[in-house]
């Protein structure tokens, strides 16, 4: 089988790249092995919250001047980063996903996490409340409502986070008949299953009535982010019907807004004419005259997937885009050059909460994100997303936007 572009990986970066190329007339194939990081996404997209040395960042665009030359943002260039950032909201809107930025165009916004802390973000789905400052205050009384038996929304943590910032919180649980049926099997009490139940109009309206019964004049009502899986408008309707300011706070994974975003992006790719190959993974490649001529997958066996261009977006260690042994780290499909320290004791920190260097391992590329193999550029193989060397996206809080911006950059390179 032959395509204009074959993309390996089914996550955020591969879908953005595939949609962009497909809409430009390229015949694209995405090979996806399964779940991706969007399933664990909060529904917010971070641009940069810390420099590599750990310095907190409030104004990411200004701070990018301090990034090393090998960082993906440095390779894209600050002016191109600004241009791509302006393209992101309309791009996602065309896919059925509404994004917004905080009040200050140059600064990070801040969202409340399931642990009750504030985390920086650049863009947010409309599901989330993006606060303009890390010093935000929540004055007044707040009612935190959870479903009985739903353990992935820790109301005590959430209450502590809001009370630390001025709110007076009260916690209540509700027993919704449709959700109670899920409790027969404890493994079914997960955010996505509740969200599917709450997609029904009679169910979410009944939930609103249960919340109203628990209210005693609170100015704020805080709810778990388990609504709008099939239709995000449900959240707007809930906000309209509850006589207080409604704040949705994310739950522990799986993430309802993240999974909805993944489904909408996949739908946009397929509606544009792209081919999505789920439940499969690239296992080998053939190289001719320094160029990739084809790949083979686990399920298709001897069938050659040929293309003019290949894009590697299979993630780092999380997505099996990189593989480790006690002695080395390698890229398993193409044998690409991987950047990592030879001293294994430098791969990790014994303090779990500290910066973990192994999360910054990645494939070496040139300034256009073409992969390096044996020190030589592979002209028709590009790398995007978290598989790129030069950044530790988890420590920097840059994962989503590195994925999106590198995908936009590479799609432009391919279309030139």
Where are the predicted features?
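N-terminal Rossmann-like FAD-binding beta1-loop-alpha1 element of flavoenzymes
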Residues: 3-30, 411
């Amino acid at each position: 089988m032959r395509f204009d572009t074959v993309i390996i990986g089914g996550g955020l970066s591969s879908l953005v790249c595939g949609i962009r190329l497909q809409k430009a007339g390229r015949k694209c194939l995405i090979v996806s092995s399964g779940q991706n990081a969007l399933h664990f996404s909060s529904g917010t997209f971070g641009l940069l919250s810390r420099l590599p040395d750990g310095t907190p960042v409030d104004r990411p665009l200004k701070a990018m001047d301090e990034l090393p030359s090998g960082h993906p943002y440095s390779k894209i260039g600050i002016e191109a980063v600004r241009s791509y950032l302006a393209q992101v909201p309309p791009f996602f809107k065309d896919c059925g996903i509404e994004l917004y930025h905080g009040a200050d165009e140059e600064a990070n916004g801040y969202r409340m996490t399931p642990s009750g802390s504030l985390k920086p973000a650049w863009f947010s789905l409309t599901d989330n409340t993006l606060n303009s400052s890390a010093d935000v205050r929540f004055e007044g009384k707040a009612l935190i409502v959870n479903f009985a038996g739903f353990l992935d929304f820790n109301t005590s943590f959430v209450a502590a986070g809001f009370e630390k910032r001025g709110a007076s919180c009260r916690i209540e649980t509700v027993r919704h008949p449709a959700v109670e049926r899920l409790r027969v099997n404890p493994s079914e009490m997960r955010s996505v299953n509740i969200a599917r139940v709450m997609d029904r109009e009679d169910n979410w309206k009944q939930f609103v009535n249960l919340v109203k019964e628990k209210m005693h004049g609170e100015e704020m009502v805080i709810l778990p982010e388990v609504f709008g899986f099939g239709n995000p408008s449900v959240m707007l309707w809930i906000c309209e019907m509850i006589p207080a300011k409604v704040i949705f706070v994310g739950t522990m994974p799986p993430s309802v807004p993240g999974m909805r975003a993944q489904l909408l992006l996949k739908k946009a790719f397929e509606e544009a004419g792209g081919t999505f190959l789920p439940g499969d993974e690239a296992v080998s490649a053939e190289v001719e005259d320094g160029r990739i001529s084809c790949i083979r997958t686990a399920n298709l066996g001897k069938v050659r997937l040929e293309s003019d261009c290949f894009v590697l977006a299979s993630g780092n260690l999380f997505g099996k885009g990189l593989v480790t042994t006690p002695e080395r780290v390698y890229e398993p499909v193409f044998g690409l050059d991987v950047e990592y320290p030879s001293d294994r004791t430098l791969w990790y920190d014994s303090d779990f909460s500290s910066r973990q260097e192994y999360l910054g391992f990645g494939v070496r590329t040139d300034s256009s994100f073409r992969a390096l193999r044996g020190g030589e550029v592979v002209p028709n193989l590009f790398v995007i997303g978290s598989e790129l060397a030069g950044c530790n996206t988890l420590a920097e809080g840059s994962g989503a936007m590195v994925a999106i911006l590198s995908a936009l950059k590479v799609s432009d390179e391919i279309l030139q």
